[in-house]
UniProtKB/Swiss-Prot annotation:
Extent of the transit peptide: 1-18
Sequence motif: Cx9C motif 1, positions: 155-165
InterPro entries: CHCH, CHCHD4
Gene: MIA40
Pfam family, any one: CHCH
Cofactor: how and how many bound: Cu(2+) or Zn(2+).
Position of sequence motif Cx9C motif 2: 178-188
Mitochondrial intermembrane side: 52-230
GO cellular component: mitochondrial inner membrane; mitochondrial intermembrane space
Transmembrane segments annotated in the record for this chain: 35-51
Domain CHCH: 152-196
GO terms of molecular function: protein-disulfide reductase activity
Record protein name field: Mitochondrial intermembrane space import and assembly protein 40
Keyword Transmembrane helix: yes
Length: 230
């Protein structure tokens, strides 16, 4: 822009200088030519400088990023990072869901099993005793057929003492504190072999099934008849 104005002005001045002089001298003509050449040279130089400046400015403008473009780029970067984070969170949540579900199922199953066991034990405890001993009343039904009439024979008292000791025993193993009473009962059995011969044989042959202690335990657990009336 500046170069064009300067060039036009130079040409106008040169023309006016030539037109105002009729019949110019050779020296004047030479001076006018020099002025035109100088003006043209200056105009070309100014144009070249201006073009170079524009080129540099355009390149700088292309390389430089506007604030708006920078903000858009930052927003895009943030959006990508946010999406990636959300995807990772979703993946982590999906991977933990099966584990949480499995753990919850195991806990519920264990709770159901424990409740069922407690109900069964409670039902068993609430039922009347099925053996010679009734834990609800703490009494022993000596007339129970499961005792085989041993409570009424010649060694009935010895049997009752041994059996009662065994039933109420809290020692471990159960009945270990009733050994002496069992010996007394067995001695009584030996005095009456005609009645307690089978029990004596069992006592003298431990390899055979049915020791006295086992029979007492079996009698306690066998099905009992209704309790005798007082």
């Amino acid at each position: 822009m500046f170069a064009r104005s300067f060039s036009n002005a130079s040409r106008t001045i040169a023309r006016r200088s030539l037109s105002t002089r009729s019949g110019p001298a050779p020296s004047s003509l030479w001076s006018s030519r020099n002025a035109v050449i100088a003006g043209t040279t200056l105009a070309i130089t100014a144009l070249a400088v201006t073009s170079e400046r524009r080129k540099v400015f355009n390149e700088s403008a292309q390389k430089a990023t506007s604030p708006r473009d920078s903000i858009i780029a930052q927003d895009s970067l943030k959006e990508n990072v946010h999406k990636k984070s959300v995807r990772q969170d979703e993946f982590s949540g999906e991977s933990t869901k099966p584990e949480a579900s499995t753990s919850s199922d195991s806990v519920e199953k264990a709770a159901d099993d424990a409740a069922q066991i407690l109900e069964e034990k409670e039902a068993e405890a609430s039922e009347p005793s099925q053996g010679a001993y009734n834990p609800e009343t703490g009494e022993i039904n000596w007339d129970c057929p499961c005792l085989g009439g041993m409570a009424t024979g010649p060694c009935g008292e010895q049997f009752k003492a041994a059996f009662s000791c065994f039933v109420y025993s809290e020692a471990e193993p159960k009945g270990v504190d009733c050994v002496e009473l069992f010996k007394v009962m067995q001695d009584c059995f030996r005095e009456h072999p005609e009645i307690y011969g089978e029990e004596i044989d069992d006592d003298e042959a431990p390899a055979q099934e049915g020791t006295m202690e086992e029979k007492v335990e079996a009698a306690k657990e066998e099905t009992a008849a209704p309790a005798a009336a007082p």
